[in-house]
């Protein structure tokens, strides 16, 4: 039975996260994993090369050693295990899942805020604090987007939730109310 990528990412990230918690190394693991993820994102063919038969095993091992040269023993062993089990193509997904577990454990929420004009840092911070309070998060990491079509106000999207405080929505609701009455 073949496992899907989400299941693989979930299982491996869970095991690694549990180890990180046990060793009190969650932040360090995450930092190392993010660096490795970036290498694989920047070089999408790397996982295929490490998984395929184009390179001899000794060259693959040399490449793995180079990749993990500055990594902790735990991360080196983890990457070696992924290689041994033919899971190098799952590395990015595993790191994404690990980061999601980290964020969940720290009550960190990622959200996108859309505004009609570019927000100042102070405005973005105020929105992040208000949103954190609303969703019970310790921290909100905002990405910003400008869309003049919303006219004014903001729309905040996070985890399949949308909080729409845009003028465009208010006008639409007003229009509906006037038409229905």
Swiss-Prot record:
It comes from Lactiplantibacillus plantarum (strain ATCC BAA-793 / NCIMB 8826 / WCFS1). One of its GO terms (molecular function) is proton-transporting ATP synthase activity, rotational mechanism. F(1)F(0) ATP synthase produces ATP from ADP in the presence of a proton or sodium gradient. F-type ATPases consist of two structural domains, F(1) containing the extramembraneous catalytic core and F(0) containing the membrane proton channel, linked together by a central stalk and a peripheral stalk. During catalysis, ATP synthesis in the catalytic domain of F(1) is coupled via a rotary mechanism of the central stalk subunits to proton translocation. This protein is part of the stalk that links CF(0) to CF(1). It either transmits conformational changes from CF(0) to CF(1) or is implicated in proton conduction. F-type ATPases have 2 components, F(1) - the catalytic core - and F(0) - the membrane proton channel. F(1) has five subunits: alpha(3), beta(3), gamma(1), delta(1), epsilon(1). F(0) has three main subunits: a(1), b(2) and c(10-14). The alpha and beta chains form an alternating ring which encloses part of the gamma chain. F(1) is attached to F(0) by a central stalk formed by the gamma and epsilon chains, while a peripheral stalk is formed by the delta and b chains. It holds the Pfam family OSCP. The keyword Ion transport applies. The keyword Acyltransferase does not apply. It comes from the Bacteria. This is ATP synthase subunit delta. GO terms for cellular component: plasma membrane; proton-transporting ATP synthase complex. PANTHER family: ATP SYNTHASE DELTA CHAIN. Keywords: ATP synthesis, Cell membrane, CF(1), Hydrogen ion transport, Ion transport, Membrane, Transport. Transmembrane segments: none annotated. It is a peripheral membrane protein. PROSITE patterns: ATPASE_DELTA. Belongs to the ATPase delta chain family. It is found in: Cell membrane.
């Amino acid at each position: 039975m073949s496992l899907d990528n989400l299941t693989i990412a979930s299982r491996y990230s869970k095991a690694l996260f549990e180890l990180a918690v046990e060793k009190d190394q969650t932040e360090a693991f995450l930092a190392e994993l993010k660096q490795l993820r970036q290498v694989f994102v920047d070089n999408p063919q790397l996982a295929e090369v490490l998984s395929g038969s184009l390179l001899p095993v000794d060259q693959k091992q040399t490449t793995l050693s180079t990749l993990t040269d500055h990594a902790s023993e735990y991360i080196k062993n983890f990457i070696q295990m992924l290689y041994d089990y033919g899971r190098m193509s799952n590395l990015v997904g595993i790191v994404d899942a690990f980061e999601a577990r980290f964020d969940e454990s720290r009550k960190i929420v990622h959200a996108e805020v859309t505004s009609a004009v570019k927000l100042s840092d102070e405005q973005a911070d105020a929105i992040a604090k208000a949103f954190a309070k609303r969703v019970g998060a310790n921290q909100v990491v905002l990405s910003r987007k400008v869309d003049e079509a919303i006219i004014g106000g903001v729309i905040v999207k996070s985890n399949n939730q949308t909080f729409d405080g845009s003028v465009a929505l208010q006008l639409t609701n007003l229009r509906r109310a006037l038409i229905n009455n």
